[in-house]
Amino acid sequence: MTRIGTPLSPTATRVLFCGSGELGKEVVIELQRLGVEVIAVDRYENAPAMQVAHRSHVINMLDGAALRAVIELEKPHFIVPEIEAIATATLVELEAEGFTVIPTARAAQLTMNREGIRRLAAEELKLPTSPYHFADTFEAYSKAVEDLGFPCVVKPVMSSSGKGQSLLKSADDVQKAWDYAQEGGRAGKGRVIIEGFIDFDYEITLLTVRHIGGTTFCAPVGHRQEKGDYQESWQPQAMSPAALAESERVAKAVTESLGGRGMFGVELFIKGDQVWFSEVSPRPHDTGLVTLISQDLSQFALHARAILGLPIPLIRQFGPSASAVILVEGQSTQTAFANLGAALAEPDTALRLFGKPEVNGQRRMGVALARDESIEAARAKATRASSAVVVEL
């Protein structure tokens, strides 16, 4: 029986976020609407979710002692990891001591590292995946590339948003892909996964929410990546009934194994009726930003309900919808966005500007959203809206 108290009072229901990016920001807003007291934690000040939380803390989240100190100080009812780069061993300890980690500390620990989740999916759950090897040294990596053949893909086992990821097409790429992977890992140099390339027709994110009443799937989200980073997404992605049924089977198997309650972003490769498991995030997914315009309950609202043990009787999808990111390149701590009237001039469009405090290189600073009569029209409209935004550094 869910009971929510009064924020900033002894009856408050407290939720603490480990990571305070744009996805967390939307979940915080949903929790604020339900009268939840929210604490946002990240490694830098004024992170997006901090701007809408009751209070915030800045710590190195890979420092287990610092993470424990904040959690023991705040005594949250729910701990919500929003990113992978967290001292997950500390979350496991805290969960054993009685804290609730969303969805589970094991899910956070397994998905922080591509090896944990790949071995779970392929070796324990026997789900279809690309052929793969792991390697710690250049020698082992070279042998894996030789074994899998070209083309193949290399990624650091610990990285996100495409960092350190390369597609190898010939022997000329072997050294530079290794060097790039060593630069791109979250915890510095280290282990990589080498995957055989799947010649897929398209890739999807199946947003899968585990809640008090069971497991519910959102309509499949199609997306386009560049260098492993999402550029645009759309919903619903057209699929054969067989491919959709197999996608739901795979997503249910992996999310059931990870357990707990919350939103999961299950990434899958599709070719005809065939489905391969790629990755899973035990939290809302960047490609799922499209649900801010495509569904009555966005992935963020669904995550909030699942966390609090509230029912999800139905998810209503509004038809062809798309998102296009607003990518900013350069250096600034005072970025401004202009020409917004033009960006929002067409019907059924929306913008989210994330409020990130700085840009240093390339950074996703917002997203344009659109609905239309077809996926093609929705994608074109979202791209027009995104392109219309003028960025001032």
From Swiss-Prot:
Enzyme Commission number(s) from the entry: 6.3.1.21
SUPFAM superfamilies reported in the protein's UniProt record: Glutathione synthetase ATP-binding domain-like, PreATP-grasp domain
Pfam family, one: PurT_C
Biological processes annotated in GO: 'de novo' IMP biosynthetic process
RNA-binding is among the record's keywords: no
Positions annotated to bind ATP: 114, 155, 160-165, 195-198, 203
InterPro entries assigned to the protein according to its UniProt record, in alphabetical order: ATP-grasp, ATP-grasp_carboxylate-amine, ATP_grasp_subdomain_1, PreATP-grasp_dom_sf, PurT, PurT/PurK_preATP-grasp, PurT_C
Keywords carried by this UniProt record: ATP-binding, Ligase, Magnesium, Metal-binding, Nucleotide-binding, Purine biosynthesis
ATP-grasp domain span: 119-308
Catalytic activity: N(1)-(5-phospho-beta-D-ribosyl)glycinamide + formate + ATP = N(2)-formyl-N(1)-(5-phospho-beta-D-ribosyl)glycinamide + ADP + phosphate + H(+)
Annotated binding of N(1)-(5-phospho-beta-D-ribosyl)glycinamide, by residue: 22-23, 82, 286, 356, 363-364
Gene Ontology molecular function: any one: ATP binding
Signal peptide positions on this chain: none
Positions bound to Mg(2+): 267, 279
Disulphide connectivity of cysteines: none
Keyword presence, Magnesium: yes
GO CC annotation, single: cytosol
PANTHER family cross-referenced by the UniProt entry: FORMATE-DEPENDENT PHOSPHORIBOSYLGLYCINAMIDE FORMYLTRANSFERASE
Similarity annotation: Belongs to the PurK/PurT family.
Function: Involved in the de novo purine biosynthesis. Catalyzes the transfer of formate to 5-phospho-ribosyl-glycinamide (GAR), producing 5-phospho-ribosyl-N-formylglycinamide (FGAR). Formate is provided by PurU via hydrolysis of 10-formyl-tetrahydrofolate.
Protein known as: Formate-dependent phosphoribosylglycinamide formyltransferase
Organism in which the protein naturally occurs: Pseudomonas syringae pv. tomato (strain ATCC BAA-871 / DC3000)
Biological classification of the source: Bacteria, Pseudomonadati, Pseudomonadota, Gammaproteobacteria, Pseudomonadales
Gene symbol of the encoding locus: purT
